[in-house]
Design a protein with these regions (language model features):
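RNase H-like two-metal-ion nuclease catalytic core shared by retroviral integrases
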Residues: 102-105, 190-192, 198-201, 212-234, ...
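Basic, flexible linker segments flanking DNA-binding modules
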Residues: 15, 22-123, 274-281
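A short acidic/small-residue loop/turn micro-motif
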Residues: 149-150, 160-165
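C-terminal domain-tail junction helix/linker
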Residues: 206-210, 232-306
């Protein structure tokens, strides 16, 4: 039986001074030790998840760890989890980088109208959104072209290129079409960059009878889903800098796989994109369309002016 504290003060005196019984003292000590053990178990789980998804956030960690926490009979909420991660230096910070321009809409090629202003997809294969983002290299940048299904958020086509030309987006589009098979009734939405307006890209869309939709401004919120996917890959699943395009390409492929099959999405009721892709009219989306958000912003601005 423990009779003394580590500083040599008898427990009986400590209990008398604090007005607690010996039983209450040991109960509190047990609770403290139990909390320390639980914290260590949680941190180990977090480290395991972060081996694959290096910047996985607090809420998604809690969701993924729910079966483990239940099995271990550990009760921890979001705020306590946040505090535990902060005390252990495991909170995810923002990534800062030198951002190159990936969209050039000052060209002579035809710019198509926006077809999705009031559209909410109800199944996979109805609306694709495409965008280009940069990946930092030790010397310069590489450029990642993505095609994402707007309903399920699944990345259906991607390609990493050394140059900001149409070749990368074309290869990403060809991958998406090859995986989809049936493109009847499909709409493809993108910004008005030259890569998406050129004959090579538009020709493939027309050949596969895919309707062409483009943003009408330079506001990234007009292609919000594509921008969000870019952000998730770069902030959670990819490193800040790679030695060369080959090393970056290997990690991009791994990141897309992790994103599609392992990462739960709050906007998809915590399903992964791969699981959401197989559902029809069953998703509980926690989001509004970019057009609806734009209307709300405009209404709010008018309200502030009156």
């Amino acid at each position: 039986m423990r009779t003394k504290e580590k500083h040599g003060i008898p427990i009986s005196i400590l209990c008398t001074l604090s007005g607690r019984s010996r039983q209450a003292y040991y109960k509190q000590l047990h609770h403290k030790e139990k909390s320390q053990v639980e914290g260590e178990l949680i941190i180990q789980q977090v480290m395991d998840y972060r081996k694959v998804q290096k910047r996985l956030g607090t809420c998604k960690l809690l969701w993924l760890m729910a079966p483990f926490l239940k099995q271990q009979e550990i009760a921890i909420g979001r705020d306590s989890m946040f505090t535990l991660l902060r005390l252990n230096g495991l909170l995810v910070g923002k990534v800062k980088s030198n951002k190159p321009r990936t969209t050039d809409s000052n060209h002579w090629m035809k710019k198509h109208p926006n077809l999705i202003q009031n559209l909410t997809p109800v199944m996979a294969g109805g609306l694709w959104v495409s965008d280009i983002t940069y990946i930092n290299l030790s010397q310069g940048h590489s450029f990642l072209s993505l095609v994402t299904d707007a309903y399920s958020r699944k990345i259906v086509g991607f390609h990493l290129s050394e140059h900001l030309t149409a070749a990368g987006p074309v290869k990403a589009l060809e991958m998406a079409i090859g995986a989809c098979g049936d493109t009847e009734g499909l709409i493809h939405h993108s910004d008005r960059g030259s890569q998406y307006c050129c004959n090579d890209y538009v020709g493939i869309l027309q050949e596969n009878k895919i309707s062409i939709s483009m943003t009408q401004s330079g506001d990234p919120r007009d292609n919000a889903i594509a921008e969000r996917v870019n952000g998730i890959l770069k902030s959670e699943l990819l490193e800040d800098v790679y030695t060369d395009v080959r090393a970056a390409g290997i990690c991009v492929a791994r990141a897309v796989e992790t994103y599609n099959y392992l990462r739960p999405h709050t906007s998809l009721d915590m399903l992964t994109p791969a699981l959401a892709h197989s559902k029809v009219n069953q998703l509980k989306h926690h989001w509004t369309s970019p057009y609806q958000r734009k209307l709300k912003r405009e209404a709010s601005m008018k309200g502030n002016q009156t």
